[in-house]
């Protein structure tokens, strides 16, 4: 390879790194990083994510009606289904390079503090009611 080819490869590598850093917007966590004081962890995270996803789906004309479920306990089967979806998604992402690099909902929303918008990025796709 010529010098210009090496330069092009290095420049392309740096460009990819900068783009990922700038536009990724995700936090990177270490395994020993403490939880953020305002982060949501464990069952609080699951409950909050479920609430955010229902509101997001209702706002976009989906099948869930957030107003109907506000103020009362959700059915146990619905809660179990949502939690098992989170577990499946976590297991599926364990092998992904992003997960190994310390990214994901626990990193973004427990180890760090994330916004409602960042929470809704982890919601399943909204289904249109028809």
Swiss-Prot record:
GO terms for molecular function: hormone activity; toxin activity. The modification 4-carboxyglutamate is found at residue 118. InterPro entries: Insulin-like (IPR016179), Insulin-like_sf (IPR036438), Insulin-rel_pep (IPR016724), Insulin_CS (IPR022353). Heterodimer of A and B chains; disulfide-linked. The keyword Transport does not apply. Pfam families: Insulin. Residues 59-92 form a propeptide. The modification Serine amide is found at residue 129. One of its GO terms (cellular component) is extracellular region. Its main location: secreted. One of its GO terms (biological process) is glucose metabolic process. Gene3D superfamilies: Insulin-like. The modification 4-hydroxyproline is found at residue 34. It comes from Conus marmoreus. PROSITE patterns: INSULIN. This is Con-Ins M1. Expressed by the venom gland. This venom insulin facilitates prey capture by rapidly inducing hypoglycemic shock. Intraperitoneal injection of this peptide into zebrafish lowers blood glucose with the same potency than human insulin. In vivo, when applied to water, this peptide reduces overall locomotor activity of zebrafish larvae, observed as a significant decrease in the percentage of time spent swimming and movement frequency. Keywords: Amidation, Carbohydrate metabolism, Cleavage on pair of basic residues, Disulfide bond, Gamma-carboxyglutamic acid, Glucose metabolism, Hormone, Hydroxylation, Secreted, Signal, Toxin. It comes from the Eukaryota. It is found in: Secreted. The keyword Heme does not apply. Residues 1-21 form the signal peptide. Belongs to the insulin family. Disulfide bonds join 29-107, 41-110, 53-123, 109-114.
């Amino acid at each position: 390879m010529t010098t210009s080819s090496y330069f092009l490869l290095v420049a392309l590598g740096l460009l990819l790194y900068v783009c990922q850093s700038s536009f990724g917007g995700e936090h990177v966590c270490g395994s020993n990083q403490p939880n953020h004081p305002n982060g949501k962890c464990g069952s609080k995270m699951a409950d909050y994510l479920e609430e955010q996803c229902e509101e997001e789906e209702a706002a976009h004309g989906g099948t869930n009606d957030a107003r109907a479920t506000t103020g009362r306990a959700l059915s146990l089967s619905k809660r179990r289904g949502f939690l098992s979806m989170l577990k499946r998604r976590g297991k599926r992402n364990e092998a992904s390079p992003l997960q190994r690099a310390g990214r994901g909902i626990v990193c973004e929303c427990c180890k760090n503090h994330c916004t409602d918008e960042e929470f809704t990025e982890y919601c399943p796709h909204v289904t249109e009611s028809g």
